[in-house]
A protein has these predicted regions:
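N-terminal secretory/targeting leader peptides
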Residues: 2-3, 7-22, 26-120, 128-129, ...
Length: 331
């Protein structure tokens, strides 16, 4: 679906009406859930959300439907989170950093250079640590159905290639609102500038920020290459993406419906992460085709030396070092 200006205004108006209404409930107990996310329609989140809708409909015998609204159509990240908490939106997914003010222990997942590889990520997200972190949402009005991913984060900018920490000094870099991300770029001498993902392209285009940090899939799908010349594969952090629903609405479902939704969301997490792995490879090739200059082997050891220990120590001071030790032990 491509939205021109007129259709976007019409769709946005419809979205406003949807947010003002409760879940669509039929006479025979049928329910249509609404799900929003900020990523483009070409992203693995959208593909997986559509798969979830098909699976829920099939396995429930048509009792559960899922309407999916991509591109931040129902609001930016904080708006959609608050809409789910209020019960105006049923499900949403976005990057872990946008939840850390509600569920502070989730900050651990965003610590720089915490994860060694994808096997390490899977052992953490799909194991006891992931289960523990999902319970951190208790009392927030949200229930974490599963942990999807955004992926490995890399730096882009419009000024110069970034090969060493010195190259990033002075650059105004859009970050998420996560304290670990902000502190890491501050330590590197950059100017971290948190903002919603839906506002980022315009900020890059207008020069309000020099650069940003995201996975290659999002850099491609969001067309950031139109405003950014240089990509450095810093792989400085991995971003999980909690898929959340309204806790009270989930509790109100019958046992079979609730179990099916959770099972489908968690199977969707495994599918989405596998799909993202494939697209990370193809997206990098396409970014080169679009003219981006890629620094494949920046001095990650030097970046790690500056940010890893102090940011992890800061987390440990606030929340204790137990979680970090458990994650390190899962490597």
């Amino acid at each position: 679906m491509t939205l021109n200006r007129r259709s976007f205004i019409a769709a946005a108006g419809a979205a406003g009406a949807l947010l003002a209404a409760p879940s669509i409930l039929g006479a025979a107990g049928k329910i249509t859930l609404r799900m929003g996310h900020p990523h483009p329609e070409t992203d693995s989140w959208q593909d997986t959300a559509l798969w979830m809708g098909e699976t829920l409909a099939e396995k429930s015998g048509g009792e559960i439907g899922l309407q999916v609204f991509p591109n931040g159509l129902l609001g930016n990240d904080p708006t959609m989170i608050n809409s789910v908490r209020a019960g105006a939106l049923d499900i949403m997914v976005t990057g872990n950093p946008f939840f850390t003010s509600l569920a502070p222990e989730l900050n651990v997942l965003d610590l720089p250079y915490l994860f060694h590889d994808r096997d390490h990520v899977a052992r953490v997200l799909d194991g006891e640590i992931g289960d523990r972190l999902r319970t951190d949402f208790e009392g927030t009005g949200l229930y974490a159905l599963a942990l999807w991913e955004t992926g490995w984060r890399h730096v882009t900018n419009s000024r110069r290639p970034v090969e060493t920490p010195d190259d990033i000094k002075g650059l105004k870099i859009r970050t998420t609102p996560n304290p670990a991300h902000i502190e890491a770029f501050r330590l590197l001498g950059a100017v971290p500038t948190p903002m919603a993902f839906t506002e980022l392209f315009t900020a890059l285009e207008m020069g309000a920020v020099d650069g940003q940090e995201n996975p290659t899939t999002l850099i491609l799908n969001s067309r950031f290459y139109e405003a950014q010349k240089y990509l450095s594969l810093t792989q400085h952090a991995f971003t999980a993406a909690p898929l959340v629903t309204n806790a009270a609405k989930l509790d109100a479902m019958d046992d079979d419906m609730r179990a099916l939704l959770i099972e489908t969301a968690q199977e969707g997490a495994r599918r989405q992460r596998a799909l993202n792995v494939e697209r990370e490879v193809t997206s990098l090739a396409k970014l080169r085709e679009e003219g981006m200059e890629v620094v494949e082997t920046p001095d990650r050891k030097a970046f790690r030396a500056i940010v890893a220990e102090p940011v992890q120590a800061s987390f440990g001071e606030e929340f204790g070092s137990e979680l970090i030790e458990q994650i390190n032990a899962a490597a």
